[in-house]
Regions:
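Outer-membrane beta-barrel architecture
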Residues: 72-74, 112-115, 166-168, 217-219, ...
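Outer-membrane beta-barrel "beta-signal"
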Residues: 328-330, 371-387
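Detector for outer-membrane/organellar transmembrane beta-barrel domains
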Residues: 204-329, 340-342
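Gram-negative bacterial Sec-dependent N-terminal signal peptides
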Residues: 1-20
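Transmembrane beta-strands of outer-membrane beta-barrel proteins
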Residues: 24-32, 81, 85-89, 123, ...
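Solvent-exposed loop segments that connect transmembrane elements
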Residues: 38-58, 99-101, 183-212, 234-245, ...
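Outer membrane beta-barrel
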Residues: 21-37, 46, 54-185, 219-223, ...
Length: 387
């Protein structure tokens, strides 16, 4: 009996040790604001003839003005020898209606499992951000804030991709990222320039290339200086074959102090249809700064400009936008914020045919510029709580 008791105690102790090496964290963001925007039209669709409609001023409640509302689980297990397993399950939701974002996915923001090894890096499998998105996120003055950041124009509507293998390694001041998607799981509606829907789930028998995607990035950060270079390619289904959407970008930042940082970058873009014909070619630029006025008050200012060289064979006006975000910290977890932006030759977040109106379709709030208008102004006040 004594030996049996000792064995039982040893088993319990070993189980406690094993459990102590694992952890799971519940986290999330609840973000809500009230917004005013002018010159807003309906999202163009094939059924309305790709017509944004007449001008209207809009007063509305939005979910995710500074950070997308979300909830998630993440965990790791120490496997010994510097090896660990990990997972992330994260959904996005509309706080104003309680509905899911990302086309109703249960875990639409991120869903992956992987392994990480000290000195080698991490490899993960599932729905993940692209290498281009990861690389540029640290060089956005507003940190890709949901409301007025033209993230789709900058990084592509495919900045999250299904069925993805992704590697990330940290080597001193250098970070390397690379990914491959067997099928992005992204579908965009037909537009005035393309009569068929764009994209799909991928993994099509006999058509390996359709809806695949890949990319890579390298970043360097040392002291006040940060630089990055990245590439992304998406091969979406267009009709019965696949097109090619390419993006390459560079970004840089410099911190003058703990309270002030400037950053900017350039992104080259080229989209071709299934026949190899050019449907879009643009050069996108951004510059901005962040300034911590007091321990509680922070500011972020950003300017975006898109040199639209070709859009479905025509010369389109070059859109630009200036935006300002001010946040006031009430605690480590709760903030108040004011955001405003003015866009010219496009809707806010530079929404237009050049983005396939993907922002408006995904968010459910139109920023399509109404007929006969050339600018749009938006102002929003909100609260963000992190848990």
């Amino acid at each position: 009996m004594k030996h049996k008791g000792m064995a039982t105690a040893a088993l319990v102790a070993s189980m406690g040790s094993a459990f102590a090496q694992s952890n799971v964290t519940l986290y999330g963001v609840a973000d809500m604001n009230i917004e005013y925007a002018n010159h807003v039209g309906n999202v163009p669709t094939a059924t309305n003839g790709f017509n944004p409609g007449p001008s209207n001023n809009v007063y509305r409640m939005n979910s995710g003005g500074w950070a997308g509302s979300r909830s998630g689980l993440r965990g790791t297990e120490n496997l010994g020898g510097g090896l660990k397993s990990l997972f992330v399950l994260e959904n996005g939701f509309n706080l104003d209606s309680g509905t899911l974002q990302q086309s109703g996915r249960l875990f639409g923001r991120q869903a992956f499992v992987g392994l990480a090894k000290d000195g080698i890096g991490q490899i993960a499998f599932g729905r993940q951000y692209t290498s281009l998105f990861d690389a540029l996120a640290n060089f956005s003055p507003t940190a890709f804030a949901t409301q007025y950041e033209p993230v789709v124009l900058e990084t592509g509507a495919n900045f999250r991709e299904d069925n993805t293998i992704k590697y990330k390694g940290q080597f001193g001041p250098v970070t390397a990222v690379a990914h491959w998607s067997f099928g992005t799981g992204l579908a965009l509606p037909a537009s005035v320039g393309i009569s068929a829907p764009i994209g799909g789930n991928g993994e099509v028998p006999g058509a390996f290339r359709r809806d695949t995607a890949y990319g890579a990035a390298v970043a360097y950060s040392n002291g006040p200086v940060g630089v990055t270079v990245a590439y992304d390619q998406w091969n979406p289904t267009i009709g019965v074959s696949s097109g090619t959407m390419k993006k390459a970008a560079v970004g840089a930042s410099y911190s003058f102090s703990d309270t002030m940082r400037i950053m900017g970058g350039y992104r080259w873009g080229q989209n071709k249809n299934a026949a190899g014909e050019l449907i879009q070619r643009d050069d996108f630029y951004w510059i901005g700064a962040t300034y911590q006025v007091t321990p509680a008050l922070g500011l972020a200012l950003e300017y975006n400009y898109d040199d639209m060289k070709n859009l479905f064979g025509a010369n389109a006006p070059n859109p630009w936008q200036v935006s300002l975000l001010a946040n006031y910290t009430l605690s480590k977890r709760t903030d108040l914020y004011l955001s405003t932006a003015y866009a010219k030759n496009a809707g806010l977040i530079l929404e237009s045919l050049g983005t396939f109106y993907a922002n408006s379709l995904a968010l459910g709030n139109s920023y399509a510029l109404a007929n006969g208008q050339s600018n749009m102004l938006g102002v929003a006040m909100g609260v963000r709580h992190k848990f």
